[in-house]
From Swiss-Prot:
Family (UniProt): Belongs to the RNA polymerase beta chain family.
SUPFAM superfamilies per the UniProt record, alphabetical: beta and beta-prime subunits of DNA dependent RNA-polymerase
GO biological process: DNA-templated transcription
An MF annotation (GO) of this entry: ribonucleoside binding
Protein role: DNA-dependent RNA polymerase catalyzes the transcription of DNA into RNA using the four ribonucleoside triphosphates as substrates.
Protein name as it appears in the record: DNA-directed RNA polymerase subunit beta
Biological classification of the source: Bacteria, Bacillati, Actinomycetota, Actinomycetes, Mycobacteriales
Length: 1164
């Protein structure tokens, strides 16, 4: 049998649809795995066999490699008691198989986790006894293949955090009073006290330890054991240091130590030993101070220290001395110095926003830090137990309490700012969420304190973080997205690839550089012209130098070249065609809005793509990919069976109509037929929002740019009725409803069909258990699950006692607490899940049974829904016209969508116009005549690839970012477009058509730009926003209606609205709004009564909020009274409560409902 071929690169995805690309530049490497950021980091944390093999090969056979968990255990071990007679060592972390599958974890609301075990070894050095045991540490959440975690049944993702790297940072500032430059330096560790040196305006060098009071730097040097002579020998070149030495006021090491202790711990009496211990612990003990590998690397790089200190994670005396020397030389204006190992190093201040000084904490490191916190809490417990337990009977398990560790992990995944609910709106939004970089979170910045500099685009972001994709609003610039080709190195710095250039010859060697390495090289752009031999064609080349400066240099000076034009942008931005013609603000909206697109009923790939669609969909993980080559044996909507070339049968289950986190529909559909030959890496089934293996978030619609009777004013959109009738823009949304039956003080709740005071017609769709049947059409107020709850026993009337005597327990009081469809929701029941204690399902304490009902809703496009293109051109559907009223092409084809021309010029997103032209060409097809004398066609032929001379109708095209179709090419192709079957071209050489008005049959006076644009239906649907209330819950204190759709609240009639009413003199309307329609508790019941009985509406009473105001003032000891017309004080107490209850009882309503979430919504 043929050996199966494992696919390594995704470049040649077998069976991929053909896209005709306008790209001129071939990248020497493929885009790396788009989820590697998450997967690789987690593989390092847990130490998977694949990671070990790869890391060992990179490091060399004789180097010991350690996973993230092994690192922490080694750091922690040994845990010794206070007398150092006993010690506990933890090592060899290992995992058992995961306890449940991903689907089970989602179903049962549990974690997708594997049990973690470590080997614990207890040593009693007095008796020489060693006891070793395997200890269970807890269930450790595992990452799924898609880079997510399942926590309590929901899919979450851990976002990578951008933080300032540990290291040494030099800074310059201007003194406000003397206007002289001052310099300072911070030594920032990963863990431990900060050490700061500075030169002040009095020309002394000072030091601050852990942000306490400043003291002369020579005090610290003397405390470290240096004599005055040694200080003079080292720093004699600096007047600053010599004057500081004279003024420091301490003579020897002991005095210096005591002086430091007094500043660090004011109010405590110092001793030499305690002062020595304080200094040692602050900077020279690994338990208290940790530079981390990355910090040591940065310090050595900056100060030019040799490799002797590579493994030392604390500060050394040499570090401190060299830092001070660098600082005084920087202040003196020197440009370079000789480092201790003899190399010449440049002297300069640091830019904290430079990506050489900011690093990523990826998933693995974030979880590792959390486990470290848990283990250090556990360490304290172990120490205490060593001292309290009998030494003979101690075993490792008796010492270890694993609760703090599992609690720390649980807390991180459940509540950390960086553990987020996965955005599953579509495949792209999930992929982008996993590639997100956040500067927020613990140890990062906060929104309020982050200034403009840190949010701004920095030259070092090039090829590392996308300059376009970031949220609008308070988080702008603090949250970014990883660029397409970027990867993260072991230190957490982002690297981007470059091609090596030797004497103007471009090679295919690719090197990855961090931002500070890149600064040392001269780098050309990817679109620099070169010939077929890969040599530059121009003598002088435009290049990028340090700090983002652009210069023109001779080609021999170029060191490297970008690998691809789309290297600087993220995946979502790289999916915007003609990005180079869009204003950056609109491109930002376009990149963000693609993530809000709802998967449609039938996905359709864009006519105009960028070539990124295939890769993004492939790596997002929502499609089914064949792992090995073979032949398809069986295909159905539910599963696909493939017999691979080794004779092994693989079955792939398709996920059908599942609910995502955002309530969109997750459905997979097969692409292959029985008997098909499939290769390794071929797509077997499409996911939501993919078409034939490509990302397909919207629909290709025939667009005309024209105003239409003012109905598309201000970005409104006019749609063809066909979009509704043929379900072109229809999506499916699934809602989940959950109810549980608990034990209450009065007895257990019961899920039943036997509900009091409910007619048989209401129960028609419930089965014998009281649960709605699958397939039932339900609307708001319908019962989904019948449930009754015992009522409190009250004093029985004689009649009830008689009934109780005759029927026994049957007449026991229960109330209806059934789960009903919420207000405004409709749909079809597509799934029911029942969990009960009897079936041994894991349920929360006190819960006997839980039922989940899934209701699907088919939402057609309607007025008020939001549509958008990929260029930030968004709008709301303003009118849906019948097909016959839409403008139509000369051959009778009606337009699908009319966009206003005013939406283009001032927004400067011209990309949408070019997309429309190329969309028309892709739909109509084109054939270029190479012998044509037309100058436009001649100009086009200079750049158009030969394989694009003839393209059939209904083809897919790709115009990659910064390397796509040029204006000249589009202009030439519009002259070469194919006619329709009648032999007529519908669109002229300028991409315009003479449209005819569907209502009158008259042609419009001017030609109109017509073509195909890819339009997305966004998740801002009018169905989810529209809301109305008649009666509903009221706030407990003010008795005013609650606010918002979620609380079934009312509309706020605010201060400005009140003024408007006053201005119009609408006194009675205003009084009604502020009393009986709001918080006049008695009045609103009387009004309801009057409406029911058909009487006149009574006069309003006193609003409840006025009474609250009085009470507030009285609580401030102000004796505020309300006086009647005759001057006597009025009592505002609620005498009307009885009246209220009588009215409520008589009318069968409750208009004084409080804000309890289960307060009944319906007026019976």
């Amino acid at each position: 049998m043929a050996v199966s071929r494992q696919t390594s690169s995704v470049a040649g995805i077998p069976g991929a649809p053909q896209r005709h690309s306008f790209a001129k530049i071939d990248a020497p490497i493929e885009v790396p795995g788009l989820l590697d950021l998450q997967r690789e980091s987690f593989a390092w944390l847990v130490g998977t066999p694949e990671w070990r093999a790869r890391a060992q090969a990179e490091a060399g056979e004789d180097v010991r490699i350690m996973s993230g968990l092994e690192e922490i255990l080694e750091e922690l071990s040994p845990i010794e008691d206070y007398s150092e007679n006993m010690s506990l060592t933890l090592s060899e972390p290992r995992f058992d198989d995961v306890k449940s599958t991903i689907d089970e974890a989602k179903d049962k609301d549990i974690n997708y986790a594997a049990p973690l075990y470590v080997t614990a070894e207890f040593t009693n050095s007095m008796s020489g006894e060693i006891k070793s045991q395997t200890v269970f540490i807890g269930d450790f959440p595992m990452m799924t293949d898609k880079g997510t975690f399942i926590i309590n049944g929901t899919e979450r993702v851990v976002v990578s955090q951008l933080v300032r790297s540990p290291g040494v940072y030099f800074d310059a500032s201007i003194d406000a009073s003397t206007e002289r430059p001052l310099h300072s330096v911070k030594v920032i560790p990963s863990r431990g006290a900060w050490l700061e040196f500075d030169v002040d305006k009095r020309d002394t060098v000072g030091v601050r330890i852990d942000r306490k009071r400043r003291q002369p730097v020579t005090v610290l040097l003397k405390a470290l054991g240096l004599t005055t002579q040694e200080i003079t020998d080292r720093f004699g070149f600096s007047e600053l240091m010599m004057s500081t030495l004279e003024k420091d006021g301490v003579d020897n090491t002991d005095e210096a130590l005591l002086e430091i202790y007094r500043k660090q711990r004011p109010g405590e009496s110092p001793t030499r030993d305690s002062a020595q211990a304080l200094l040692e612990n602050s900077f020279f003990k690994a338990k208290r101070y940790d530079l981390a590998k990355v910090g040591r690397y940065k310090v050595n790089r900056k100060l030019g220290l040799g490799g002797d200190t590579d493994g030392v994670m604390t500060l050394t005396e040499e570090d401190i001395l060299t830092t001070i020397e660098y600082l005084v030389r920087l202040h003196a204006g020197e440009k370079s110095m000789t480092s201790p190992d003899g190399t010449e190093i440049p002297i300069d201040t640091d830019d904290i926003d430079h990506f050489g000084n900011r690093r990523l904490r990826t998933v693995g490191e974030l979880i590792q830090n959390q486990v470290r916190v848990g283990l250090s809490r556990m360490e304290r417990v172990v120490r205490e137990r060593m001292t309290t337990q009998d030494a003979e009977s101690i075993t490792p398990t008796s010492l270890i309490n694993v609760r703090p560790v599992s609690a720390a992990i649980r807390e991180f995944f459940g509540t950390s700012q960086l553990s987020q609910f996965l955005d599953q709106n579509n495949s792209l939004s999930g992929l982008t969420h996993k590639r997100r970089l956040s500067a927020l979170g613990p140890g990062g910045l906060s929104r309020e304190r982050a200034g403009l500099e840190v949010r701004d685009v920095h030259p070092s972001h090039y090829g590392r973080m996308c300059p376009i994709e970031t949220p609008e609003g308070p988080n702008i610039g603090l949250i970014g997205s990883l660029s397409s080709y970027a990867r993260v190195n072991p230190f957490g710095f982002i690297e981007t690839p470059y091609r090596k250039v030797v004497d103007g010859q471009i090679t295919d060697e690719v090197y990855y550089f961090t931002a500070d390495e890149e600064d040392r090289h001269v780098i050309a752009q990817a679109n620099t012209p070169f010939d077929e031999n890969h040599r530059f064609t121009e003598e002088r080349i435009e290049v990028r130098l340090r700090g983002g400066d652009v210069e023109v240099v001779p080609y021999t000076e170029v060191d490297y070249m970008d690998v691809s034009p789309r290297q600087m942008v993220s995946v979502a931005t790289a999916m915007i065609p003609f990005l180079e013609h869009d204003d950056a603000n609109r491109a930002l909206m376009g990149a963000n809005m693609q993530r809000q697109a709802v998967p449609l009923l039938r996905s359709e790939a864009p006519f105009v793509g960028t070539g990124m669609e295939l890769r993004a969909a492939y790596d997002a993980g929502d499609m089914i990919i064949a792992p090995k080559a073979g032949v398809v044996e069986y295909v159905s909507a539910d599963y696909i069976t493939v017999m691979d070339d080794e004779g092994v049968r693989d079955t792939f289950m398709l996920r059908k109509f599942e609910r995502t986190n955002q309530g969109t529909c997750y459905n997979q559909t097969p692409l292959v037929d029985e008997g098909d030959r499939v290769e390794a890496g071929q797509v077997l089934a499409d996911g939501p929002g993919t078409d034939n293996g490509e990302m397909a978030l919207g629909k290709n619609l025939l667009v005309a740019f024209m105003p239409w009777e003012g109905h598309n004013y201000e970005d409104a959109i006019i749609l063809n009725q066909r979009m509704v009738e043929e379900d072109v823009l229809t999506s499916i949304h699934i809602e989940e409803y959950e109810i549980d039956a608990r034990d209450t003080k009065l007895g257990p709740e019961e899920i039943t069909r036997d509900i009091p005071n409910v007619g048989e017609d209401v129960l028609a769709d419930l089965d014998e258990r009281g649960i709605v049947r699958i397939g039932a059409d339900v609307r708001d107020g319908d019962i989904l699950v019948g449930k009754v709850t015992p009522k409190g026993e009250t004093e029985l009337t004689p009649e009830e006692r008689l009934l109780r005597a005759i029927f026994g327990e049957k007449a026991r009081e229960v109330r209806d607490t059934s789960m009903k469809v919420p207000h405004g929701e409709t749909g079809k029941v597509i799934g029911v899940r029942v969990f009960s204690r009897e079936d041994d399902d894991d349920l929360a304490a006190g819960v006997n049974e839980m039922v989940r009902v899934y209701v699907a809703q088919k939402r057609k496009i309607q007025d008020g829904d939001k549509l958008a293109g990929r260029h930030g051109n968004k709008g709301v559907v303003g009118k849906i016209l019948p097909q016959e009223d839409m403008p139509f092409l000369p051959d009778g084809t009606p337009i699908d969508i009319i966009l206003n021309t005013h939406g283009v010029p001032r927004r400067m997103n011209i990309g949408q116009v070019l997309e429309v032209h190329l969309g028309w060409l892709a739909k109509a097809g084109w054939k270029v005549d190479p012998d044509s004398q037309d100058p436009k066609i001649q100009k086009m032929l200079e750049t158009l690839p030969e394989e694009l001379y003839e393209i059939p109708a209904d083809s897919l095209t790709a115009t990659p970012v910064f390397d796509g179709a040029s204006n000249a090419e589009l202009s030439g192709l519009l002259r070469s477009s194919l006619p329709n079957r009648d032999g007529e071209r519908q669109v002229d050489d300028f991409g315009k058509s003479n449209l005819i008005d569907g209502r009158s049959g008259e042609p419009f006076p001017y030609p109109v730009a017509v073509g195909y644009m890819y339009m997305l239906k966004l998740h801002h649907l009018v169905d989810e926003k529209i809301h109305a209330r008649s009666t509903g819950p009221y706030s407990m204190i003010t008795q005013q209606p609650l606010g918002g759709k979620a609380q079934f609240g009312g509309q706020r009639f605010g201060e400005m609205e009140v003024w408007a009413m006053q201005a119009y003199g609408a006194a009675y309307t205003l009084q009604e709004l502020l009393t009986i329609k709001s918080d006049d508790v008695v009045g609103r019941v009387k009004v309801y009564e009057a409406i029911v009985k058909g009487e006149n509406i009574p006069d309003p009473g006193i609003p409840e909020s006025f009474k609250v105001l009085l009470k507030e003032l009285q609580s401030l000891c102000l004796n505020v009274e309300v006086l009647a017309a005759d001057g006597t004080p009025m009592e505002l107490s609620s005498d009307d409560d009885d009246e209220l209850e009588n009215a409520n009882a008589a009318l069968g309503i409750n208009l004084s409902r409080d804000e309890r979430p289960d307060a009944d919504m319906d007026v019976s």
